[in-house]
């Protein structure tokens, strides 16, 4: 089901997942990914399989200038150091200066005081899209969570109100990812279903999803970009699962499936429901 009418950014059209995938593959948007050590290779391969062009540029000496050239920027705090944080801030400043969309993934921001402070600082810079699991989004909005590491300890539906509050406060589209994903801009809500139960057993798939959201934000408005990325992930995950025996075979079949999914496969998909809690 296509998205209902919604406000979009000044330059990006509102596209269905099918049209967004076609636009992404037609333009191969250059996407700057400042992600963690664990995720770099799989994130780059994910973007290549989907049809985008990754660039893993993170040093402060060049990240800001490169962000001015990229069509989207993604920030993931999975493996932090002061030097990397400086590079993140420079990239955000570079993207903001030219109106380039950027995505924030506050991985396990509740795990330490330093990590929490960095996440809060980056969030205050008003990301175009904010992606996290339910525990990350709940904690970022000031709620309680039992999570301590990178994995969620709360169901997606428990973070719905927190996601809406964050979206309204920061003007961001917020995605809460899990077995069923929730996306909101503070007013509209979409749920995306599909994927595979093996996805949480393959490291860095969520981090790669953050990068893919950035790539889609280069070709369509933020809400639609987020839904398109989730829909493509869900479709590819379901296809890979059908031919896999476990998380090992799923990991490489998932990349094949990403490359094989066509815009027609996402046309009229029933994976997306709008304004569903």
UniProtKB/Swiss-Prot annotation:
InterPro entries: Hyethyz_kinase (IPR000417), Ribokinase-like (IPR029056). The keyword Nucleus does not apply. Gene3D superfamilies: 3.40.1190.20. ATP binds at residues 131, 177. One of its GO terms (biological process) is thiamine diphosphate biosynthetic process. It catalyses: 5-(2-hydroxyethyl)-4-methylthiazole + ATP = 4-methyl-5-(2-phosphooxyethyl)-thiazole + ADP + H(+). Substrate binds at residues 56, 204. Disulfide bonds: none annotated. Catalyzes the phosphorylation of the hydroxyl group of 4-methyl-5-beta-hydroxyethylthiazole (THZ). This is Hydroxyethylthiazole kinase. It comes from Gemmatimonas aurantiaca (strain DSM 14586 / JCM 11422 / NBRC 100505 / T-27). The gene is thiM.
């Amino acid at each position: 089901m296509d998205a209902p009418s919604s406000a979009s950014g000044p330059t990006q059209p509102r596209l269905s997942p099918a049209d967004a995938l076609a636009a992404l593959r037609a333009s191969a948007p250059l996407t700057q990914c400042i992600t963690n050590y664990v995720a770099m290779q799989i994130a780059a391969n994910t973007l290549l399989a989907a049809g985008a062009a990754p660039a893993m540029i993170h040093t402060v000496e060049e990240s800001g200038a490169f962000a001015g050239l990229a069509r989207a920027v993604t920030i993931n705090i999975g493996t932090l150091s002061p030097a990397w944080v400086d590079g993140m801030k420079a990239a955000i400043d570079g993207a903001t200066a030219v109106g380039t969309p950027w995505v924030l993934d506050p991985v396990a921001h509740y795990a330490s005081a330093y990590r929490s402070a960095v996440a809060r600082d980056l969030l205050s810079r008003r990301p175009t899209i904010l992606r996290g699991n339910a525990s990350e989004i709940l904690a970022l909005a000031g709620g309680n969570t039992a999570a301590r590491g990178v994995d969620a300890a709360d169901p997606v539906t428990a973070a719905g109100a927190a996601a809406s509050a964050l979206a309204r406060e920061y003007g961001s589209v917020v995605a809460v990812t899990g077995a069923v994903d929730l996306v909101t801009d503070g007013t509209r809500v979409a749920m995306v279903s599909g994927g595979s139960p093996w996805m949480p057993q393959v490291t860095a798939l969520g981090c790669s999803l953050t990068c893919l959201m950035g790539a889609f934000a280069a070709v369509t408005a933020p809400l639609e970009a987020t839904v398109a990325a989730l829909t493509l992930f869900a479709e590819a995950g379901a296809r890979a699962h059908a031919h896999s025996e476990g998380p090992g075979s799923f990991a490489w079949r998932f990349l094949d499936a990403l490359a094989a999914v066509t815009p027609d496969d996402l046309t009229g998909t029933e994976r997306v429901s709008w304004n569903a809690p």
